[in-house]
Amino acid sequence: MSKNNISHTSVRHKLSLIGVIVTLGIVFGDIGTSPLYVMKAIVRAGDTVNAEYIIGAVSCIIWTLTLQTTVKYVLIALRADNKGEGGILALYALIRRHSKKWYYLLAIIGASTLIADGVITPSITVLSAIEGLRAYEPETPVVPIALCIVTVLFFIQQFGTNAIGKLFGPLMLIWFTLLGVLGTMNIGEYFPILQAFNPLYAVRLLASSPEWFLILGAVFLCTTGAEALYSDLGHCGINNIRTSWAFVKIMLILNYLGQGAWIISHVGNLTPGVNPFYAIMPHGILFFGITMATIAAIIASQALISGSFTIFSEAMNLKFWPRQKIKYPTDVKGQLYIPFVNISLYVLCVIVILFFQNSENMEAAYGLSITVTMLMTTLLLSAYLTIKRTHRWAVTLFLIAFVGLESIFFVANMAKFMHGGWVTMLLASVMIGIMYIWYNATTIRNAQIIVRDIRDSYSIISDIKADESIPKYATNIVYLSKLGGTYEIEQKILYSIINKHPMRADHYILLHIDYQDTPSTLEYDTVTLIPDTLYRINLRLGFRVHPLVNRYFRQIIEDMVVQKEFSLASAYPSLAKHKVMGNFVFVLINRLYAAYSYFSFRDRMIMNAYEWIDKLKLSITRSLGLDTSNVLIENVPLVVRSRTSNHANAIPRVERVENEEEENVK
C-alpha cells in the first residue's frame, strides 16, 4: 500500500499590517455598511423620538456589537476552526462524526437562511448608497442605477475579481476612517450621547417601550455581518480578523454615536425619509461620501457573492446540494465561480430591488433569516465546545446567553414577517427542502448498496483477463466505487465485470472518492489486490477541494508508474513496439430509482422529489472532470435492501401455487 499527497499547501495567516488591511476588504464589508441604514431604521421604529430613545437605541447597538459580534464570533466562534476554515458548514464538518445524526438539520437550516438573507444584502447596501444622491437631486432614478450596478457586479464574476480585489482593503480602510471621523465630528452636537456606553439605558428603553420588538429588529441590522466574519476565517486568519475588528468596532461605534447626537440635536425638525448617515456629512464632502458608500456597498456585495460560491461548493461536497459546474477564473486559491449560483442570485437580487423599490421597504425583509443562522451556529458551537471537553457549566452558560439573546432577536424580527420578512423565509424554506431531500436521498441510495468481498472473485477476474475468447473491452477499466474498504466491492460492479457481459481488460481499477471533514485534504492511497491485474485507489478530497478527478487520476497513475506499481504499456506487441500506451475507460454504475411500494412512505416521498431535483445537477462525468469519450454509464435498477440483515425479505416473495388445469390433465 502506498499513500501520497497530490499537492501540499500550507497557508499561514500571520498577523501583519498588510494582512489587517486585506482583511478589511474581505471580512467587514457587510457589517461595515450597516451605518447606511441602521439609525434610519431606528428612527422609523420609534413612536416618540427623543434623547432618551436615541441614547437607549445607540446603547443597544453598542452592546449588540459587544455581545453578539465580539464575544460570540470574534472571541469564541473564531476558535472553532476546521484546519483554519470557518463558517457554519465547516463547523458542521468538524463535529459531524462526534455529534448526533440530526445535527445535519442545523447545518442545512443555517446555510439556507444565510444564503437567503444574502440575497437582500447587495440590494439594500447598493440602494442605501445610491439614495444619497437624492440630497443633490430628489428625482434621482435610484432603482435603475442600482440595477445597473448589480448587473455589472454579477457579470464580472465570471472573469474573477483578483485585479480589483487588491484595492478592496485600502478602500475599506478609507471607508472605516471616514465613518470614525464623521462620527467624531458630530458627537459634540450632544455630548450626553456618550451615556450610551452604559447598558442600563438599553435595558430601560426596551423595558419601557411597547414597540421594543420594532426597536430590536432595527438594532439587529448592525450585526448581520457577524456570520460572514466567521465564514471568512479561512481567507484571512484569526489574528488578522481580531486585530482589524478592534479598529472596525471603534469606527462603527463612533459613527453610531455621531448619528445619534445629530438626531437628538435635530429631533424637532426631522423630515420623513431623512438618512442620518448622510445628514452628518458636511455638504462639501457629500459627493465623496456617497461615492465611498457606493464603493463600500459594492465591496460588501462582492464579499457576499464570493462567500455564496464557497457555501454552495462546500454543500456539494457534503452531499447537501446537487453538483453544479464550477469554474476557476483566476489562480487565486479558493476563488471560484459557479454559473448557476451566480445567475440565480442575480435574478433574485433584481426581483428584490424591483419588488421593494427602496431601502426603507427592504429593512423590513432584512435580518429575519440571519437570526435563524445565528441560532443554528450557536447550537453547533455548543456541540463543538462539548466535544472539546469544555466545562459543562461554561457550555450551559454559553447556550443560555446566546440562545436567549438570539431568540429575543428572532421574536423581534418576526414582526417583519408580513412586511417583507416572508421573502427571505420563503427562499430559505425552498433551499432547506432541496438540501434535506438531496442529503436524505443520497443516504437512502447508499444504504441500498450490496457489499461483497472482492477476494471471493479473485480467481474469476484473473480467468476473465486470461480468456482470449472474450473480446478485450479496454486495456484499463476504471470503476468508480462508493466503498472505501480495501476488500469491499459493490455487487453491481462484480455483475458488470463478470455477468452482464464479461469485461475483459489487462487492468481493473477500483477508484473511490472519499470526501473528508477537513477543508483542504488532497491525498490518495493505493492497494494492489491482484498483481498486474486489480488495484484499488482511495482518493481523499477536502470539502473545499473541487473534484477534478480526471487530473488527479492522471497524477496518481504517473506516480504508480514511477514506483513500478503499474504499467502503461499496451498488451498488444504491435502497439507496445511503438510505445503506444493502453487506453483507459471509466465505468459508472447509475442506479435508477423505481417507486417500489416496499419503500417507506417517507422514503418514497424523498425519492420522488429527488428525481425532480436530480435534473438540476451537473452530469457525473462533467462534475468529476472526466473525458466523456472514455466513459461508459451502465444503468441498473436501485434494488431495495431490507432494513434487517436478511436481504431476501426486502422484496415480497412470489408464492408458487398449483395450476388447476395441470391437475386435470394429470
Regions of interest found by a model, annotated:
Residues S2-K666:
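The structured alpha-helical core of multi-pass membrane proteins
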